UniProtKB/Swiss-Prot annotation:
PTM notes: Maturation of lantibiotics involves the enzymatic conversion of Thr, and Ser into dehydrated AA and the formation of thioether bonds with cysteine. The C-terminal lanthionine undergoes decarboxylation. This is followed by membrane translocation and cleavage of the modified precursor.
One GO CC annotation: extracellular region
InterPro entries: Lantibiotic_typ-A_Bacillales
Function summary: Lanthionine-containing peptide antibiotic (lantibiotic) active on Gram-positive bacteria. The bactericidal activity of lantibiotics is based on depolarization of energized bacterial cytoplasmic membranes, initiated by the formation of aqueous transmembrane pores.
Covalent cross-link Beta-methyllanthionine (Thr-Cys) as placed by the record, residue numbers: 8-11
Record key words, sorted: Antibiotic, Antimicrobial, Bacteriocin, D-amino acid, Lantibiotic, Plasmid, Thioether bond
Protein name: Lantibiotic mutacin B-Ny266
Cross-link (Lanthionine (Ser-Cys)): 3-7, 16-21
Length: 22
């Protein structure tokens, strides 16, 4: 999993790694 710091503000699910941040 990617680090939470790489998550975009608002948790935009545009990237495959962002889905893990939500």
């Amino acid at each position: 999993f990617k680090s939470w710091s790489f998550c975009t503000p608002g948790c935009a699910k545009t990237g495959s790694f962002n889905s893990y941040c939500c």
